[in-house]
């Protein structure tokens, strides 16, 4: 009987119940909330489901992300090896490859002025950087946090890894993806605040057709120019444009299909679960996380406002030919931000179709956020 009792006692001590803290229960509840938002409300389900599940796993069984050095048997946890791919910036780069293979840069090529709107929206990133410095972050952690303003999860993860801010990676990634999902809620009030009803109702001329040659040359030219000026962007911009060249060349359909489907989804699973696994209670429930969430929101709002305000400038310069609403799409949440521009414009005039016009700044924002990350890496000599 003593053997049975001892066995039962050992089994009881092996359960997670006796080892969980109140913080673990809080994070488990957050994981449940994210799963609800992803499945029921369909807020970025492809990303929030794996992130939430990784969060759930690590707060029940912390050893799932333990490193080999910390493990008693010298073997790391499963998600530790996924996470190494984040630290090495492999997964974010592969995400960019897939995004490039899925992205139509036609609206940007047809209306190059969209580049300026995409650049203007990056103001939120640099304003948040200086605000983060004032809030006590060091220069590298401030840069890693401020990139959230681009509403681009992979770039946020990429820069945090490159700058050695892996301790902040979990809160940064969760904040970035959360704001991507909340674009339809956060942006409209800002857009309406800085525009008039007349401006929101402006109809833009149809975009010109883009030739196949232009589409093929675009990724080659962008890669050459951007990487010559900022070589640190080669990893992200290079992968983005390689994926797009797969798409537009028309001669490697198998590579296009693989990059935009099978590879993309595999990488999303690895990236999401490993990022979620960095959100243990000890790492996540602290004042730094609150600061990151606030700074991310400020950066995103400032970026949206800057895009809209620059859109107003272009509207004035072109004598009313550009609807300022498309400026808000300069953040790199593709295609959510462009859809929001369309929705807000349609509220004033249901016959106003802004989606394709907004896609120009939207895809420019993807390039712009990658360039902003490259600027930070160049500043810090990475």
Model feature map: region roles:
Residues 1-74:
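N-terminal alpha-helical transmembrane segments of multi-pass membrane transport
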Residues 34, 57, 85-109, 243-246, ...:
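Hydrophobic transmembrane alpha-helices of secondary-active transporters
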Residues 39-48, 67, 81-82, 102-117, ...:
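Interfacial helix-loop-helix linkers and transmembrane-helix boundary segments
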Residues 88, 96-102, 117-127, 131, ...:
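Alpha-helical membrane segments and immediately flanking helix-loop junctions
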Residues 108-129, 280-307, 358-362:
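Entry/N-cap segments of selected transmembrane alpha helices
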Residues 167-185, 295-303, 326-329:
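Alpha-helical transmembrane segments
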Residues 178-251:
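Membrane-embedded hairpin module used as a gating/binding unit in multi-pass transport
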Residues 223-307:
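Transmembrane helical segments that form the transport core of multi-pass membrane transport proteins
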């Amino acid at each position: 009987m003593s053997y049975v009792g001892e066995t039962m006692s050992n089994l009881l001590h092996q359960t997670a119940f006796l080892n969980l803290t109140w913080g673990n229960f809080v994070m488990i509840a957050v994981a449940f909330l994210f799963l609800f938002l992803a499945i029921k409300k369909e807020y970025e389900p492809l990303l929030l489901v794996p992130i939430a599940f990784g969060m759930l796993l690590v707060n029940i069984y912390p050893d799932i992300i333990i490193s080999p050095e910390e493990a008693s048997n010298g073997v790391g946890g499963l998600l530790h090896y996924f996470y190494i791919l984040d630290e090495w910036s492999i997964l974010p780069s592969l995400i960019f490859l897939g995004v490039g293979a899925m992205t139509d840069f036609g609206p940007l090529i047809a209306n190059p002025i969209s580049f300026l709107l995409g650049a203007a929206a990056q103001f939120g990133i640099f304003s948040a950087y200086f605000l983060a410095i004032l809030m006590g972050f060091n220069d590298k952690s401030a840069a890693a946090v401020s990139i959230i303003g681009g509403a681009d999860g992979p770039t946020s993860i990429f820069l945090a890894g490159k700058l050695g801010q892996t301790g902040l990676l979990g809160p940064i990634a969760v904040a970035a993806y959360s704001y991507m999902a909340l674009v339809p809620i956060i942006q409209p009030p800002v857009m309406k605040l800085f525009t008039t009803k007349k401006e929101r109702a402006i109809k833009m001329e149809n975009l010109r057709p883009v030739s196949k040659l232009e589409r093929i040359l675009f990724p080659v030219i962008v890669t050459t120019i951007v990487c010559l000026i900022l070589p640190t962007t080669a990893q992200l911009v290079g992968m983005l444009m390689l994926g797009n060249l797969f798409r537009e060349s028309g001669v490697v359909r198998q590579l296009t299909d693989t990059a935009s489907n099978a590879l993309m989804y595999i990488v999303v699973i690895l990236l999401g679960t490993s990022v979620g696994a960095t959100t243990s209670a000890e790492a996540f429930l602290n004042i730094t996380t609150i600061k990151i969430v606030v700074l991310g929101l400020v950066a995103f709002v400032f970026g949206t406002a800057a895009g809209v305000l620059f859109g107003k400038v272009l509207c004035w310069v072109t004598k009313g030919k550009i609807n300022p609403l498309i400026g808000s799409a300069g953040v790199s949440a593709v295609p959510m931000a462009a859809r929001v521009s369309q929705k807000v414009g349609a509220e004033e005039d249901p016959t106003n179709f802004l989606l394709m016009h907004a896609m120009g700044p939207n895809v420019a924002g993807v390039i712009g956020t990658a360039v902003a990350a490259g600027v930070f890496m160049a500043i810090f000599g990475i």
